[in-house]
Amino acid sequence: MTGILIKLDDRPDIIFDNGTFYGGLHCGDCFNVQTNQWINVRLEYSDEWVVFYRGKSYPVPFGKRVEI
């Protein structure tokens, strides 16, 4: 299923194309983010929510299309 990555109640979540919510993402959850192509990332939390891609951390790409 695909949707848009959002922040809801201080936690990343996904709103799907049909209007339903995933229900909140958790540390260790993996999903695909659409950039120029689909990339697989892992969600983690330290001082803030980040995603890991190829061993590096990046800010969570809120507003991007994701696939889970």
Describe each model-derived feature in a short phrase.
Residues M1-G23:
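Mixed-charge, Lys/Arg-rich low-complexity intrinsically disordered regions
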Residues I4-K7, N32, R42, R65-E67:
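Ser/Thr- (and often Asn-) enriched beta-sheet segments in non-cytosolic proteins
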Residues L8-D10, L25-D29, E44-E48:
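A short, compositionally biased
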Residues R11-D17, F31, E48-F52:
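Short polybasic amphipathic segments
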Residues F21-T35:
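Short coil-to-beta transition motif at edge beta-strands of beta-rich domains
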Residues Q37-I68:
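Short, compact, well-ordered microdomains
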